[in-house]
Amino acid sequence: MAARRKFFFVAWWIASGLAPALVAQQSPLAPPRPTAARILLLPRRIVSGERATLAVLDVNGRLAPGVTIRFSNGDHLSTDATGRALFVAPLNPGVIFGSIEGRPGRVSSMILTPTEASAPSMEISAAPHVATLTDRFEVFGKGFCGDADANHVTIGDHGALVLASSPLALTVLPPTELEPGPAKLTVSCAKRDAPEFSVVFVELELAADASPLRRGEHRTLTVRVRGTSEKISLEARNLAPDVAELEGGNPLRRLSSGGDQENVAPFEVVGKKNGTFLISIRLVSALGRPEGH
């Protein structure tokens, strides 16, 4: 599979430029160094005794094979050639934690009983109203397949990649062919399908001065939103606070201006010393009942 672009729309400004931070691909890769495996995608809801799929991303955002995942109940497994791993959820309901071996931090998942997860047909209970073209996003409901590849997700008539899954949750990467704007989304697996619903997909573009940042200099970074005239929430995070200060706090959330002509959100940094600064920007999108469902 051809390389895909960023999941989380993390925009990295390195002194003067914008570079894609996360790139995903499904083709087999050489196992990454332990320190390169950074992000564990574990379905937030799994079902006792039933299958689920997790995924691991490396430092460049690619799906990472050969990475060991350890669970708080003592179980462990490794991702396969696609950077994912199929596993059976523990029998005991409750919270379980997973972590990448050799990396700090852990991710939680709630184990529900089969009775709690049962439904006569596939249903969607929560999905984002807005997502970015390059971000992964989550869909919650019932009746999905635990094997990620058994789920068929289409967005605007294009196939999407299911990164992680359980009967109750999907983590989806939009197709590269998708254009900004509203799109219909369908989900099906094992001869079950959910009613079609809509998600607005936006493209985030950076407009910034390309000259080096100097100590005491104020620099405005403007994020342009394409695909909607609505105000959307963006979060900026300063990843190099010793080099520059993000005015307004760290992290800082801001609504875009909204509008048909120009939908923008400005962020300002102040140089503390000459050097490389890193600012990440991500869309903040709440989950809710899907539209058109």
What positions do the PLM features span?
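Beta-strand-rich domain onsets/edges
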Residues: 25-52, 114-117, 207-218
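Surface-exposed, proline-enriched loop/turn segments that connect beta strands in immunoglobulin-like
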Residues: 40-43, 73-74, 124-128, 206-210, ...
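Ser/Thr/Pro-rich low-complexity tracts
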Residues: 108-207, 274-276, 280-293
